[in-house]
C-alpha cells in the first residue's frame, strides 16, 4: 500500500516535470515563427486532427469516396490495398499519407504542395530543414511515407491500411520518424503567395 502511494506521487512529480519540459520545447520550436505562419500551421494541424480516427484510403486525397471512386481506386491499385469492408470507405473522406498533408495544406492555404510523397518532396526540395530545427507543420518523409509534425514531440499521419487505431489517421510520437527528411511547407507557401 505504502509503495503504491510513493509510486503515485513519483509519477505525478515526473509527469509535471515532463510536461514543463515539453512546453519549453514547444516554445523553442515556435520561437522564430511569425504569428501569421503559426496561425496557418495551427489551422492545418487542427484540420488534420479533426480527421483523426478516419480509416486510411490508398490513393485518397481528401475526396468523398463514392462507389465509383472506390472502384477506380481498386482498378488502379488492386483489391489488396483496400482490406476493410467497402462500407468503411464509401461516403467518407479518403486519405492516404500524402493525401492528408496535401489536403490540409491546400484547404487552409489554397496552395498545392503535391499529391504523392515523391511530388511533395520535389515541390518542397528547396525547403529542407534539419530535424534539430523542426517546427510545427513541418513534414517528415521516410521511405514512401509522410507525417506532419504537430509540436511537442508529436506527429499526425494517415498511418496504414490496417483498421484504426492500428492504422488510419492517428497521432503518435516523433521518435519513430527521426531518421526521416524534414521539409517546411509554410516557407514554400509564403513564396507562392508573394508571387501572386
What are these regions (language model features)?
Residues 6, 177, 194-196:
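N-terminal leader/targeting segments
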